[in-house]
Amino acid sequence: MNLSGLNMRGLLLADEPMSRHTSLRVGGPADLFAIPEDADDLQGLLRQLKERGIPWLAIGRGNNLLVRDSGIRGAVISLERFNRVEALGQGRIRAGAGAENLAVVRFAQEQGLGGIGFISGIPGTVGGAIRMNAGAYGTGIMERTESLTLLHDGNVREFGRDELEYGYRHLDLAAGDIILEALFRLDQREAEQTEEEIRKDLELRRAKHSVGFPSAGSFFKNPAGQTAWRLIDATGMRGERVGGAQVSQVHSNFLVNTGGATAGDFLELSRVVKKAVLASCGVTLEEEVRIVGEE
């Protein structure tokens, strides 16, 4: 794999440990870690990677990502510099994929807009939230999304929400599509009301989800009509440990890094939990975290 001579305006790092770029603090090295400056820089990099036959993976802040210990062959592309947020009028806000969720909510608040306060306490970026249709309390972020700007087949294109397929904790995108921006349509709302929504969301999440160790948030999706944490609790798996990975004592749908964990520890703990839930409850859990890297 020829990685030498790649040219871009942003930052290029070789053999970069992915443990530095995931909230779980695990993961082997990426052959190449790239941080493009903007869409033009990204397009130029992708053209070079395609010419050389180098595979790539785009990420946000790594809050919902589990990278295997062998790392990632090819390039990892971080969209952290795609963080611009702007008001367009008529209740619309455009946010780059790399913009932090809470920062977008705060920006909307300054414009007298609200309706996405439920993402205030969700760690990560707009791109990651959209990719997983992140939500809380029965609402998903796609319900507030008017359109997405994607890098699609190498070209920048805007897709209306009615052109996209999405559901609980997922958005169906074509292979190779990269989310660049989201256009939200929000409600007129007093800043004080939005502040109260933010405060309640952050307090509730701190009370329920402050687990004290690095985690990826909810590790498993909630099966239809059920909650993953109740199923895990029913098996007595709260506190179960494999190496440095543990089922959180605070919230049993959080798998946490108590120190020195490997990706292999998390994968094995996930397998043990899924096996126990299937045997005890007859339900097959599905990971909500995105698992990537060399097997």
Curated annotation (Swiss-Prot):
Question: Known EC number(s)?
Answer: 1.3.1.98
Q: What is this protein called?
A: UDP-N-acetylenolpyruvoylglucosamine reductase
One GO CC term, this protein? cytosol
Write the gene name.
murB
Known catalytic reactions: UDP-N-acetyl-alpha-D-muramate + NADP(+) = UDP-N-acetyl-3-O-(1-carboxyvinyl)-alpha-D-glucosamine + NADPH + H(+)
The answer to keyword Cell cycle applying to this record is yes
Q: Which cofactor does it need?
A: FAD
Compartment list = Cytoplasm
Q: Which UniProt keywords apply?
A: Cell cycle, Cell division, Cell shape, Cell wall biogenesis/degradation, Cytoplasm, FAD, Flavoprotein, NADP, Oxidoreductase, Peptidoglycan synthesis
